[in-house]
């Protein structure tokens, strides 16, 4: 695993086994998917207690695969108010298993 990406923090509860989460700074995540082989990066601003969906992600979709993946809900909720250290820049990297 990339040392720039931390393990999923307890502040996030991941329900869907088909999706993995990693917390990282956006500048570390951008560029990892340039050849469409790496993880798909979706910057998401987290809201306490709110389920997130990829429809909330701000990403330019340039392939049908991305469009299909965007419609898949991310079963993630904030379980507590996270600090900046726990969720740097409030961005999450979402990848498909």
UniProtKB/Swiss-Prot annotation:
One of its GO terms (cellular component) is mitochondrial membrane. GO terms for molecular function: identical protein binding; protein sequestering activity. Residues 8-97 form the 9b domain. A motif (Nuclear export signal) lies at residues 45-53. GO terms for biological process: negative regulation of defense response to virus; negative regulation of mitochondrial fission; positive regulation of autophagosome assembly; symbiont-mediated suppression of host cytoplasmic pattern recognition receptor signaling pathway via inhibition of MAVS activity; symbiont-mediated suppression of host type I interferon-mediated signaling pathway. It comes from the Viruses. The keyword Repeat does not apply. It is found in: Host cytoplasm; Host mitochondrion. Signal peptide: none annotated. Keywords: Host cytoplasm, Host mitochondrion, Host-virus interaction, Inhibition of host innate immune response by virus, Inhibition of host MAVS by virus, Inhibition of host RLR pathway by virus, Viral immunoevasion. InterPro entries: Protein_9b_Betacoronavirus, Protein_9b_SARS. PROSITE patterns: SARS_9B. Pfam families: bCoV_lipid_BD. The keyword Aminoacyl-tRNA synthetase does not apply. Homodimer. Interacts with host TOMM70; the interaction occurs only with monomer. Plays a role in inhibiting the host innate immune response by targeting the mitochondrial-associated innate immune response. Acts by binding to host TOMM70, inhibiting its binding to HSP90AB1 thereby disrupting the interferon activation pathway. Belongs to the coronavirus group 2 protein 9b family. The open reading frame (ORF) encoding for this protein overlaps with the N ORF. This is ORF9b protein. It comes from Severe acute respiratory syndrome coronavirus 2.
